[in-house]
């Protein structure tokens, strides 16, 4: 039992030493309806594309584009999923997926998960972010706060 306690303590201490940095992303641009399937008066599927620019707290500015699927049932958004591409200088790219649960949809808050990235910033993969998105007509504004490893932040700063 004593050995087990020591093992858990060692794991806890080693995880406690992993340092993370706040990575802030602000995105803005235009929303365009790509395709819509109207199943009934109350049910549909809409596919949007978002295109615009982003800036971050590492001093970067770049392009962002997203593909968003929205499923509405009984006039209520039941599911929202998106794939987002960030394009930095020198064509360095990072991809994240966005998901919002039913209870988060009206709040405009969800989570991003970085799934792929160029080799030069690959330490960002598996990082999680909380984001908020707001729309005004066909314009969007998104603010995301990510907790990323220090190594990932340094990689992003060096783009």
Q: What is each of the regions a protein language model found here?
A:
Residues 4-14:
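Sec-dependent N-terminal signal peptides
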Residues 20-159:
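Beta-strand-enriched cores of mature, soluble protein domains
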